[in-house]
Swiss-Prot record:
Keywords: Hydrolase
GO molecular function: hydrolase activity
EC number(s) on file: 3.-.-.-
Source organism per UniProt: Bacillus subtilis (strain 168)
Listed name of the protein: Uncharacterized isochorismatase family protein YaaI
Domain of life: Bacteria
Similarity remark: Belongs to the isochorismatase family.
Length: 181
């Protein structure tokens, strides 16, 4: 059981990047990995649950090893090697864009007594935004470290951050600011 009411969500970071603009997103994702890893270490030190929630890539299995194997290629290998979950982390699969849609995430967060989520991952303008929207609908407090999300374009990422701040009342911050609190 968590000692805090916060949890770190890591969305879709186990990814094959084999889609339109996948190469662009992979390059942007490489830049956020160190920030997410730093935040992950901070979460571990503070005993916050670390929850990976990921696309299933047609496998429909919550077996992280199979998903990692399915996603590993020249474009994704370095990212997956660095960011992969460890045994102490939670791992859930999702069928669509939101981490809440048709998943056990809300039940898990309730069981862990989490009321504040820090959302990281990709793509900021799709899966992170939809997850933040559904978190808002469930009355979670939301923090988005802007150096821990990436989208296909900087404009799309900025638009998503603006929406999350102005419509979903998410706190937009940085990994460093979260650690300094």
């Amino acid at each position: 059981m968590s000692k805090a009411d916060k949890a770190l969500l890591i969305v879709d970071m186990i990814n094959n990047f084999e889609f339109d603009m996948g190469e662009t997103l992979a390059k942007k994702t490489e830049k956020i990995v160190p920030h997410i890893l730093s935040l992950k270490e901070h979460a571990r030190q503070n005993e916050w649950p670390i929850i990976y929630i990921n696309d299933h890539y047609g496998l429909w299995q919550a077996d992280i090893k199979n998903i990692q194997q399915e996603c590993t290629n020249e474009r994704s290998k370095d990212i997956i090697t660095k960011i992969a979950p460890v045994d102490a982390d939670y791992f859930l699969i999702k069928p669509k864009h939101s981490a809440f849609y048709e998943t056990a995430l809300h039940t898990l967060l309730t069981e862990l007594q989490v009321r504040h989520i820090i959302i990281t991952g990709i793509a900021g303008n799709i899966c992170v935004l939809f997850t933040a929207n559904d978190a808002y609908m469930r009355e979670y407090s939301i923090t988005i470290p802007k150096d821990c999300i990436a989208s296909n374009s900087d404009e799309d990422n900025e638009f998503a951050l603006t929406m999350m701040e102005n419509v979903l009342f998410a706190e937009i911050t940085t990994e460093e600011q979260i650690i300094e609190k």
